[in-house]
């Protein structure tokens, strides 16, 4: 399959974003998949147009977006995105939408159509912390996952799409002893394992849910 993997530019006064750092280190061929890479701005207003133009000019079987989730201690494939922008902080264009629908004609939520449990289990099988997430937040990460679901629903019925959040890397948590992080090479290994699992036509039926 031809897979587009995206990462984000740094945001919130940081000078590094582990999502893009990890994406740049992925191999160009993973299993039977050909990988293209794209850096997205952390911008509510810009990402949609960039994704739209990229999909209009290239054929991709899968789009897998990667984002930073500071404070998480695992690599977390996302199950679902919701139709809301509610930014705790402004984006890199100093734009801070609050309680705004992403697409007025979109569904309340879009579920990733990738085998997210198989991807999560593949990460865990590498001896890495992995967990299935049921919330992509309400910032630009959720926005991108929702927009991909919207595009699949309205324009690209055969497109497969998903999102994975990754933790901070160690240099981001210097002076923050209680904040979890993960070495970049382990994040790359986890993403590679997850991408390999995309080949699964059906997802695993295993218990990876939460009680709260």
From Swiss-Prot:
<comment type="similarity">
    <text>Belongs to the peptidase C15 family.</text>
</comment>
<feature type="active site">
    <location>
        <position position="141"/>
    </location>
</feature>
<dbReference type="InterPro" id="IPR033694">
    <property type="entry name" value="PGPEP1_Cys_AS"/>
</dbReference>
<dbReference type="InterPro" id="IPR033693">
    <property type="entry name" value="PGPEP1_Glu_AS"/>
</dbReference>
<dbReference type="InterPro" id="IPR016125">
    <property type="entry name" value="Peptidase_C15-like"/>
</dbReference>
<keyword id="KW-0378">Hydrolase</keyword>
<dbReference type="GO" id="GO:0016920">
    <property type="term" value="F:pyroglutamyl-peptidase activity"/>
</dbReference>
<dbReference type="Pfam" id="PF01470">
    <property type="entry name" value="Peptidase_C15"/>
</dbReference>
<comment type="subunit">
    <text>Homotetramer.</text>
</comment>
<keyword id="KW-0963">Cytoplasm</keyword>
<feature type="active site">
    <location>
        <position position="165"/>
    </location>
</feature>
<protein>
    <recommendedName>
        <fullName>Pyrrolidone-carboxylate peptidase</fullName>
        <ecNumber>3.4.19.3</ecNumber>
    </recommendedName>
</protein>
<dbReference type="GO" id="GO:0005829">
    <property type="term" value="C:cytosol"/>
</dbReference>
<dbReference type="InterPro" id="IPR000816">
    <property type="entry name" value="Peptidase_C15"/>
</dbReference>
<dbReference type="InterPro" id="IPR036440">
    <property type="entry name" value="Peptidase_C15-like_sf"/>
</dbReference>
<dbReference type="GO" id="GO:0006508">
    <property type="term" value="P:proteolysis"/>
</dbReference>
<feature type="active site">
    <location>
        <position position="78"/>
    </location>
</feature>
<comment type="function">
    <text>Removes 5-oxoproline from various penultimate amino acid residues except L-proline.</text>
</comment>
<keyword id="KW-0788">Thiol protease</keyword>
<keyword id="KW-0645">Protease</keyword>
<dbReference type="InterPro" id="IPR029762">
    <property type="entry name" value="PGP-I_bact-type"/>
</dbReference>
């Amino acid at each position: 399959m031809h897979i587009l993997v995206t990462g984000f530019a740094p945001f919130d006064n940081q000078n590094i974003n582990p999502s893009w750092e990890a994406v740049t280190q992925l191999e160009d061929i993973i299993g039977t998949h050909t990988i293209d890479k794209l850096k997205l701005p952390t911008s509510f207003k810009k990402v949609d147009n960039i994704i739209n133009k990229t999909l209009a000019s290239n054929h991709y079987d899968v789009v897998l977006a990667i984002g930073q989730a500071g404070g998480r201690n695992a690599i977390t494939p996302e199950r679902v995105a919701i139709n809301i922008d509610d930014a705790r902080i402004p984006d890199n264009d100093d734009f801070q939408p609050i309680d705004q629908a992403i697409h007025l004609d979109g569904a309340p939520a879009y579920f990733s159509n990738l085998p997210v449990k198989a991807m999560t289990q593949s990460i865990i099988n590498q001896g890495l912390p992995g967990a299935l997430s049921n919330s992509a937040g309400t910032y630009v990460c959720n926005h991108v996952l929702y927009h991909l679901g919207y595009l699949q629903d309205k324009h690209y019925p055969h497109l497969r799409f998903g999102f994975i959040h990754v933790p901070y890397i160690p240099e981001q948590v210097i002076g923050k002893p209680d904040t979890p992080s993960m070495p970049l090479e382990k994040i790359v290994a986890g993403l590679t394992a997850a991408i390999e699992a995309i080949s699964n036509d059906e997802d695993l039926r295993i218990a990876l849910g939460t009680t709260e």
